[in-house]
Every structure is written in C-alpha cells, then in structure tokens.
C-alpha cells in the first residue's frame, strides 16, 4: 500500500511518483502524480480520483478537470516534494 505523502522513484525511468490527497471545495481528491525528474513537469501518466463516499473513489477522466487538478496539485505539492527530493 502506498501512503499519502509518498515519493517513489520509478525504476529504470527518469520519473518520480508522488501520492497525496487534497480537499478542494469539500471534495477529497487523491492523486498519483508522475513527474519527470529533469523538467519537474507532471506527465500524462498522472492519475486523479475523487472520493464520493467513505469507500468509493472515482477516476477523473474529464480533461478540463484533470488540468484544473494538475494546477492545484502542482501549486500545492510539487515544489514541496521537489525540495524534499533534493535534500
């Protein structure tokens, strides 16, 4: 099980996977953000889910919603994690 707030170096790839969650407008979102090590930009392999009840996560597939969430998560988490990786 991958815990929230994890940074995982993907083997044989120049990427990290960051897992975390955030509450936006009362909805809990979970992410698995795959980030290129060199450019520090999230890749298309990133996945987002929203929690609709205590036991159910739904994948987010709408491109506009994905772009919105990438922006939130990048602004909120990416710099923090990249600083942690560099230390």
Residue ranges, per PLM feature:
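Short beta-strand or tight-loop elements
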Residues: 14
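Short coil-to-beta transition motif at edge beta-strands of beta-rich domains
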Residues: 1-8
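Acidic, low-complexity intrinsically disordered segments
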Residues: 54-85
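Basic, polyanion-binding surface patches
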Residues: 3, 19-60
